Swiss-Prot record:
<feature type="repeat" description="PPR 12">
    <location>
        <begin position="462"/>
        <end position="496"/>
    </location>
</feature>
<feature type="repeat" description="PPR 1">
    <location>
        <begin position="77"/>
        <end position="111"/>
    </location>
</feature>
<feature type="repeat" description="PPR 6">
    <location>
        <begin position="252"/>
        <end position="286"/>
    </location>
</feature>
<keyword id="KW-0496">Mitochondrion</keyword>
<feature type="repeat" description="PPR 5">
    <location>
        <begin position="217"/>
        <end position="251"/>
    </location>
</feature>
<feature type="repeat" description="PPR 13">
    <location>
        <begin position="497"/>
        <end position="528"/>
    </location>
</feature>
<dbReference type="GO" id="GO:0005739">
    <property type="term" value="C:mitochondrion"/>
</dbReference>
<dbReference type="Pfam" id="PF13041">
    <property type="entry name" value="PPR_2"/>
</dbReference>
<feature type="repeat" description="PPR 9">
    <location>
        <begin position="357"/>
        <end position="391"/>
    </location>
</feature>
<feature type="repeat" description="PPR 7">
    <location>
        <begin position="287"/>
        <end position="321"/>
    </location>
</feature>
<dbReference type="InterPro" id="IPR011990">
    <property type="entry name" value="TPR-like_helical_dom_sf"/>
</dbReference>
<comment type="similarity">
    <text>Belongs to the PPR family. P subfamily.</text>
</comment>
<feature type="repeat" description="PPR 10">
    <location>
        <begin position="392"/>
        <end position="426"/>
    </location>
</feature>
<keyword id="KW-0809">Transit peptide</keyword>
<feature type="transit peptide" description="Mitochondrion">
    <location>
        <begin position="1"/>
        <end position="20"/>
    </location>
</feature>
<feature type="repeat" description="PPR 4">
    <location>
        <begin position="182"/>
        <end position="216"/>
    </location>
</feature>
<keyword id="KW-0677">Repeat</keyword>
Amino acid sequence: MLAKISSSAKRFVHRSLVVRGNAATFPLSFSFCRRRAFSGKTSYDYREVLRTGLSDIELDDAIGLFGVMAQSRPFPSIIEFSKLLSAIAKMNKFDLVISFGEKMEILGISHNLYTYNILINCFCRCSRLSLALALLGKMMKLGYEPDIVTLNSLLNGFCHGNRISDAVALVDQMVEMGYKPDTVTFTTLIHGLFLHNKASEAVALIDRMVQRGCQPDLVTYGAVVNGLCKRGDTDLALNLLNKMEAAKIEANVVIYSTVIDSLCKYRHEDDALNLFTEMENKGVRPNVITYSSLISCLCNYGRWSDASRLLSDMIERKINPNLVTFSALIDAFVKKGKLVKAEKLYEEMIKRSIDPNIFTYSSLINGFCMLDRLGEAKQMLELMIRKDCLPNVVTYNTLINGFCKAKRVDKGMELFREMSQRGLVGNTVTYTTLIHGFFQARDCDNAQMVFKQMVSVGVHPNILTYNILLDGLCKNGKLAKAMVVFEYLQRSTMEPDIYTYNIMIEGMCKAGKWKMGGIYFVASALKE
């Protein structure tokens, strides 16, 4: 069997290297790695450090420890070096592990299968798959047979190296070589298949695992559920939950929360609530993510009473709401006209040391503007800037709209200039709001100036912009200019709507041009 595995493995390595044009051997001295200066004399005993564990070791201490170990005579065992390399790899410092592997070879310290596996994994994790394969070839020449850990590392390298067909072939070869793919193998391949938009193959792999005598575990099912939900395939995800139940595998809160969040995103809030009830009936306790997804979803769809009920339930269970929960509820209360409740939630956030985000601040600014509390809205803008939460165009648009509605378009223009100084570019909503604001203030010249500026900077007016401009011109006795704008609109790719025609008909009639108004009326009727 060993001979069979060895010959099959060598064929695999040879094909992977030669077909791809990679180097067929691994450099003896790891000469491709950068060299480091290692810390030398220190007073502590490396054995004591290794004995107490490396789970919390800092990077600088790990580098210093390697320096001490490299200068110790006799050398520490390869097992002790492996412990350190593994700890550094867990910090995602893959290049450093490879560099230390080079140093060990220079010092004459021979690697074993465990260190080879660590190094192969590091090459794969930093997208140097050709060198991982070369190192595999070298270790096999030295008499080390790859184990399932080696091959799983290579599989991960193929999946993340845009070689998904090679990854699938590797799993088949593993069986031919006498290896039994485990849940890590299949879960890695599932991640890779989703990474390359092969969802149906990933789902089919669950059945394939069972056929090969490898029962998928919670992690494997979780990987498939997560991949399906990211694509919006919630029906398939729900079917998979049923498969798990049939296989006597209990879904955990992470899997349920993933599906609930996906159902919420695709407007299946009732299905999400039903699944929430189902998970509770099965004894799975929802967490803050589960609640936040549902509360945010229900608020978005105007189901505030359901959202409030869930919040009460959440607090009763001593599950602390997070930023998402608070922000969703604040926005919901603002839209419902209950600013006092929104403010209380904001105060509760601050008490709990939860920093508001741009969405939270923008919602509150909108609430203040709706009630004409513009001073407080401006103060909230200044507060968010002081807190290094920089406003975006939506935030400024909300405040500009508030001032324009209050017939304080001059303040709106100040805010427009302020946002421009911050490097933010006004959009169609910004300019349309200002045009409307100037017309409300009976400042026809500045309204036209803003429109011209809008066009000159490449911001495209929409039909609402044109309707506001035409209405403002007609009501301010500038019918001739309105006619020019209307004719331009007709020549453009944008279609006038019923409101456009009504504005022009009313303008014509007010100016005593009844005949022309009648023509526009007929045109609007034909339009309908």
